[in-house]
């Protein structure tokens, strides 16, 4: 994949699978450090890789899986691990940028996690999971107002759709093709007109497996711009 990206001139953000919840203990820290070091050493010579990542939505599960009285300990542990991984990354590759993706919650700013990497990545879904489209404008404008020095990437944005669902009156989270289209038609101009947003990635290119999801298509995250026709319409790959 990286060789194809090199040849096609595609830009790559590559990251290790440290996501959702940072475990306490030396074993987790050692494993994350090893994974980061291996990733950088294996792929250092690919010119398509422009940044390394080492956490994605790192505290999104804490409110559901950790008792309130233990939250501060987990926040401190996550912050310490992030600082350690940032130091490891810069020792391995002093030339590329570091990055981290956050879900749309101010806790990353509050605990200082968003101060560590070179680039801040926000996974934002206003108009899909929550609120309305204009909440996206308010979020990114306020973020830039408070932290004008930070390069900001919209590391994820997208809406789910099922090709079997069509609507003349599309609504938020209805999984119709029409709502996905409205979502993207709002987000793309909103991103492009803000020069402080230095990049954006639509999530996702194609529908993919997600075991825990029970939505329009069980076990599938269907935010893809393309879909697997075997899931919906065709009994045979030859018909796709």
Task: Give the role of each language-model region.
Residues 40, 188-189:
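Generic structural signal for well-ordered alpha-helical scaffold segments
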Residues 157-172, 194-230:
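Aromatic/acidic polysaccharide-binding cleft in carbohydrate-active enzymes
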């Amino acid at each position: 994949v990286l060789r194809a990206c090199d040849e096609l001139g595609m830009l790559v953000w590559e990251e290790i699978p440290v996501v959702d919840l940072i475990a306490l203990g030396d074993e987790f820290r050692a494993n994350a450090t090893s994974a980061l070091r291996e990733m950088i050493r294996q792929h250092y010579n690919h010119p398509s890789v422009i940044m390394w990542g080492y956490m994605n939505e790192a505290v999104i599960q804490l409110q559901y899986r950790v008792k309130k009285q233990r939250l501060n300990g987990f926040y401190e542990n996550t912050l310490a691990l992030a600082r350690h991984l940032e130091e490891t990354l810069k020792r391995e590759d002093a030339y590329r940028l570091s990055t981290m993706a956050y879900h749309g919650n101010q806790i990353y700013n509050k605990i200082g996690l968003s101060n560590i990497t070179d680039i801040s990545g926000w996974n934002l879904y206003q108009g899909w999971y929550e609120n309305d489209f204009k909440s996206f404008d308010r979020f990114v404008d306020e973020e830039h107002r408070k932290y004008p020095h930070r390069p900001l990437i919209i590391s994820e944005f997208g809406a789910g759709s099922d090709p079997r669902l069509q609507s003349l009156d599309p609504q938020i989270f209805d999984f119709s093709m029409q709502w996905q289209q409205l979502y993207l038609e709002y987000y793309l101009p909103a991103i492009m007109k803000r020069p402080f947003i230095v990049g954006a990635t639509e999530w996702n290119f194609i529908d993919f497996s997600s075991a825990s999801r029970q939505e329009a298509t069980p076990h599938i995250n269907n935010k893809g711009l393309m879909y697997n026709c075997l899931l919906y319409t065709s009994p045979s790959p030859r018909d796709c």
